């Protein structure tokens, strides 16, 4: 069954600005600017008032209506990223082949050695410009 109209709104806090043009959302806050492209989803996005964004779908089926809340959640995560930021803690865990992880180029590249017993070295470039990587040497059990 198709509903005539389904919508949801996202409230933006003070200090966070946003622009929407052709389903491309730009969010700017104290920690930087994020951009997300939602052109693959066929729905309307419009500014309502100064600090609200409405996501609307006309005559949507169940999957399209579920995508409305998904878009709003992505935008809320963008707001969280430009206000508070994110921190990721990662550990290398192995069962048989001991993995060796080293930092190269001043923390811009991570080299993974002996991954699944491979002889090659896997360099992983970190594309984030505001990324801070710390190598924790103490073993945790």
From Swiss-Prot:
It comes from the Eukaryota. GO terms for molecular function: rRNA binding; structural constituent of ribosome. It holds the Pfam family Ribosomal_L6. One of its GO terms (biological process) is cytoplasmic translation. InterPro entries: Ribosomal_uL6-like (IPR000702), Ribosomal_uL6-like_a/b-dom_sf (IPR036789), Ribosomal_uL6_a/b-dom (IPR020040). GO terms for cellular component: cytosolic large ribosomal subunit. Keywords: Ribonucleoprotein, Ribosomal protein. Belongs to the universal ribosomal protein uL6 family. This is Large ribosomal subunit protein uL6.
